[in-house]
C-alpha cells in the first residue's frame, strides 16, 4: 500500500478462500466504516463512511457507492456479489472517478475475479451445514490445447440455504431460502505481441424467496403470500489492450441484462393472525434493467524516475447508458367487523420506464518531485441526461453536468513507511420525486433535487514495523457534504401498507469525519493477529424542512465498527481462527429517530490440510446473538395501526463443514 494516496482496504485470495459463506454481504464486516441495508433477502445497497442509498423504492437509480465486478458497473445491485473464485476485493473509501470511468461519491467496491492462467489449475469446494446449507463450486482453467496464446477459466457455483426462518402459517422452512448460482467464463487471447483481448461471459441467478419481516421481530414469519427477491443478470464484456511506445491503449466494453422481481406480503400476516379484521395486502415489482458501457483509456508506462520521465498518467472517456422498465402490481383488502360497508378492496397496476446517458472525461497525473515524493492531480467532468415516463402521466427529463477532482501528496519516509495527504471532490447526480401531482415544469422545490457534492480531506500513514512483523495503516478524514441528498418516507393511507410515498430533498449540508485503523501483527511464528477499527461521526445540518434533525447523525452511520481476529497455526497442517466483528448503534432512517442496538458477532474456524485437500469446521455467530440490520417505523397492525419500530434481524448461529481441493 506504499504508493496509495487514499484509504483502501484489500481483501486477498487467501482470506476470501477461507470464508465459508461466499458472499460480500458476510465479508463486509471485515471492512471498517462499511455498512449495508438488507431490506429484502440480500443486501443490495452499501454505505461507506455513512454515505449511500438504503433502498431503491421509487427513486432515480443513482448510487453514491460504486460497485464494480471486473470493471463492469453493478452499482445498486450488490446482491449479486457472490465471492467464489475471487482474486481480491478492493474497498476504496472517499470520492473516486479520476482514474476509471465509474464515478463514486462515497467510495467504490471493486471485485476482481480470478484470471485465466498459463498453466492448468483449479479449485473444487463443497460445504454443508445447518439450516439446509449445501454449497458446491468448481473453477478451473489454463491454456487451450491448440494455442499457448489462448487461455480460459470457467467458474461454476451454487449456494443453497433455507434462509434461517420458519413460516408458522404454512409450516415451511424454505419461504426465505437462498438458491444462488454463479456461472462465469473468461477467455484471454494474446492476438499479437503487443495486442491482447479479454472476453467475459457470466450469469448470476439469485432465486431467493423473500419472507423476512415479522410483527414481533422474531425469525418466525406468518405470511400467507410470501414474496420474492430474485435477480438474474447476464453479462458480456470485452477488453482490448494495445501497447504503444510510451503508453497502453485500453478499450472496455460491456453489456448487462438484468431481470428482477421484488415482491412481498405487505401485511406480514394471514387471516388467522389478523382476525377478526380482514387485512391482506401484497406488492409486486417486475424490473428489467439493461446497461451499455464503453470506456477508452490511455495509460502511460510506469515512470522510471530518469530526468526525462518523472510522470505517469491516465486519461479516458466513458459512456454509460442504463434503461430500466418497471411493472408494479399492488392489491389488498381491509375490513373491520364493526363496519357494515366493508371490506374494502384495492388493486392497482402501473408501469414506468427510465433511461439515462452519462458521458464523462477523466484523467490523473502522478509527478515524482523526487524519488520519495509524489504529487498527484486528477479531474473528472461528467454530463448526464435522463428521461422518465410512467402510466400515471408523469414525465421528466433532467440533465446536468458535474465537476470533481483530486490532489494528493505522497511522501515515502523509508522503504517500509509512507504518509499522504489528499483533497478530493466527488459528486452524485440529481433526480426527481414521483407521485407529487406536479407538472414537470412546476417550480415546487420538492419536484427535483440537485446533485450532491462532497469534499473529502484525508491524511494517512502506512508503515511496517519491527522487521515487518507489524503492518499498520491509519487514516483520518473529514468530509463536507453540500446539497446532501436525504430520503424520507410517509404512509399516505395507514390501513394500506402499499401507499408509501418517498421524497428525496437536498439538505443544505452535512459532515462526516472519523478515523480508520488497520493493524496486522505477527505475534509469533505460529500466531497472527489483526485489528480493524472505524470511528465515524456524522451530522445533518441546515435542512430547512426538517429543523428537528439539526445536528443529528445520518442514517446507517454507526459511530464504531470493528473486526478483531487471531489465527493460530497449531501444526503445519492444522490451524484455528477466531474473529469478532461488530457495530455500534445507528439510526435506521432520516424519517424517524429509532436506532439499532450495538452488537458483536464471534466466528470460529478450524482448518486441517492434507496435501491438496483442506477441511474446515466453522461456526458463524457462535453465541447466537440476536441483532438487527434494518428497521422500519410505521403502523402495520389492525385496527389502530399505531406507529412502532419493526426490525429485520440478521442470521442466527450457523455451523458447517467445508472441503476444498486445489489442483
Set out the residue ranges of the language-model regions.
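Structural signature of Gram-negative outer-membrane beta-barrels, strongest in the C-terminal barrel
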Residues: 188-193, 202, 298, 310-312, ...
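Gram-negative outer-membrane beta-barrel transporters
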Residues: 299-300, 313-316, 368, 372-375, ...
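C-terminal beta-signal and adjacent terminal beta-strands/loops
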Residues: 482, 529, 582-587, 608-663
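Short acidic/polar hinge/loop motifs at secondary-structure boundaries
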Residues: 56-57, 64-95
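Transmembrane beta-barrel wall of Gram-negative outer-membrane proteins
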Residues: 121-123, 128-161, 165-208, 232-234, ...
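N-terminal periplasmic accessory domains that precede
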Residues: 45-47, 91, 103-126, 134, ...
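Membrane-embedded beta-barrel scaffold of Gram-negative outer-membrane proteins
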Residues: 239-266, 412, 418-424, 450-513, ...
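Surface-exposed extracellular loop regions of Gram-negative outer-membrane beta-barrel proteins
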Residues: 205-218, 321-325, 385-387, 410-458, ...
Amino acid at each position: 500500500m506504499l504508493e496509495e494516496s487514499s484509504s483502501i482496504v484489500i481483501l486477498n485470495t487467501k482470506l476470501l478462500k477461507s470464508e465459508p459463506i461466499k458472499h460480500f454481504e458476510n465479508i463486509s464486516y471485515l471492512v471498517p466504516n462499511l455498512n449495508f441495508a438488507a431490506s429484502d433477502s440480500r443486501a443490495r445497497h452499501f454505505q461507506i463512511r455513512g454515505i449511500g442509498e438504503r433502498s431503491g423504492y421509487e427513486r432515480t437509480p443513482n448510487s453514491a457507492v460504486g460497485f464494480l465486478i471486473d470493471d463492469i458497473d453493478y452499482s445498486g445491485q450488490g446482491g449479486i456479489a457472490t465471492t467464489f473464485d475471487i482474486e481480491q476485493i478492493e474497498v476504496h473509501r472517499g470520492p473516486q472517478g479520476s482514474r476509471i470511468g465509474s464515478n463514486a461519491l462515497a467510495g467504490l467496491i471493486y471485485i476482481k475475479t480470478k484470471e485465466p492462467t498459463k498453466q492448468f489449475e483449479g479449485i473444487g469446494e463443497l460445504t454443508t451445514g445447518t439450516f439446509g446449507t449445501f454449497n458446491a463450486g468448481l473453477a478451473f482453467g489454463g491454456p487451450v490445447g491448440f494455442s499457448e496464446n489462448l487461455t480460459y477459466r470457467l467458474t461454476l457455483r451454487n449456494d443453497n440455504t433455507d434462509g434461517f426462518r420458519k413460516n408458522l402459517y404454512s409450516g415451511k422452512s424454505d419461504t426465505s431460502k437462498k438458491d444462488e448460482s454463479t456461472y462465469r467464463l473468461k477467455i484471454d487471447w494474446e492476438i499479437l505481441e503487443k495486442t491482447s483481448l479479454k472476453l467475459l461471459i457470466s450469469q448470476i441467478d439469485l432465486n431467493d424467496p423473500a419472507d423476512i419481516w415479522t410483527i414481533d421481530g422474531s425469525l418466525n414469519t406468518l405470511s400467507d403470500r410470501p414474496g420474492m427477491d430474485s435477480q438474474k443478470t447476464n453479462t458480456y464484456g470485452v477488453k482490448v489492450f494495445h501497447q504503444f511506445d510510451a503508453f497502453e491503449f485500453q478499450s472496455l466494453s460491456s453489456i448487462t441484462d438484468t431481470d428482477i422481481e421484488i415482491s412481498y406480503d405487505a401485511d406480514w400476516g394471514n387471516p388467522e393472525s389478523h382476525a377478526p379484521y380482514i387485512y391482506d395486502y401484497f406488492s409486486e415489482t417486475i424490473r428489467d434493467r439493461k446497461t451499455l458501457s464503453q470506456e477508452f483509456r490511455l495509460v502511460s508506462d510506469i515512470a522510471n524516475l530518469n530526468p526525462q520521465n518523472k510522470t505517469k498518467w491516465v486519461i479516458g472517456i466513458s459512456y454509460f447508458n442504463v434503461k430500466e422498465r418497471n411493472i408494479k402490481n399492488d392489491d389488498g383488502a381491509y375490513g373491520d367487523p364493526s363496519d357494515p360497508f366493508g371490506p374494502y378492496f384495492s388493486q392497482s397496476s402501473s408501469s414506468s420506464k427510465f433511461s439515462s446517458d452519462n458521458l464523462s472525461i477523466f484523467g490523473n497525473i502522478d509527478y515524482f518531485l523526487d524519488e520519495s515524493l509524489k504529487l498527484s492531480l486528477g479531474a473528472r467532468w461528467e454530463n448526464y441526461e435522463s428521461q422518465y415516463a410512467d402510466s400515471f402521466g408523469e414525465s421528466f427529463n433532467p440533465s446536468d453536468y458535474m465537476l470533481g477532482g483530486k490532489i494528493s501528496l505522497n511522501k515515502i519516509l523509508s522503504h517500509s513507511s509512507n504518509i499522504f495527504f489528499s483533497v478530493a471532490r466527488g459528486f452524485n447526480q440529481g433526480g426527481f420525486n414521483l407521485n407529487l401531482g406536479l407538472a414537470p415544469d412546476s417550480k415546487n422545490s420538492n419536484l427535483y433535487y440537485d446533485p450532491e457534492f462532497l469534499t473529502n480531506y484525508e491524511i494517512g500513514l502506512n508503515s511496517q514495523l519491527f522487521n515487518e512483523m507489524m503492518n499498520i495503516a491509519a487514516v483520518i478524514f473529514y468530509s463536507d457534504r453540500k446539497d446532501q441528498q436525504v430520503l424520507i418516507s410517509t404512509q399516505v393511507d395507514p390501513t394500506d401498507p402499499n401507499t408509501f410515498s418517498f421524497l428525496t430533498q437536498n439538505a443544505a449540508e452535512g459532515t462526516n469525519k472519523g478515523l480508520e485503523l488497520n493493524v496486522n501483527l505477527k505475534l509469533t511464528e505460529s500466531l497472527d493477529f489483526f485489528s480493524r477499527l472505524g470511528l465515524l461521526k456524522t451530522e445533518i445540518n441546515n435542512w430547512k424542512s426538517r429543523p428537528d434533525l439539526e445536528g443529528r447523525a445520518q442514517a446507517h452511520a454507526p459511530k464504531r465498527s470493528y473486526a478483531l481476529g487471531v489465527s493460530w497455526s497449531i501444526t503445519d497442517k492444522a490451524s484455528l481462527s477466531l474473529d469478532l466483528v461488530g457495530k455500534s448503534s445507528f439510526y435506521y432512517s432520516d424519517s424517524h429517530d429509532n436506532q439499532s442496538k450495538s452488537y458483536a458477532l464471534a466466528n470460529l474456524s478450524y482448518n486441517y490440510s492434507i496435501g491438496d485437500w483442506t477441511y474446515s469446521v466453522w461456526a458463524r455467530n457462535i453465541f447466537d446473538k440476536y441483532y438487527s440490520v434494518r428497521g422500519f417505523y410505521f403502523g402495520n397492525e389492525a385496527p389502530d395501526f399505531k406507529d412502532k419500530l419493526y426490525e429485520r434481524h440478521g442470521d442466527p448461529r450457523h455451523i458447517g463443514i467445508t472441503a476444498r481441493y486445489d489442483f
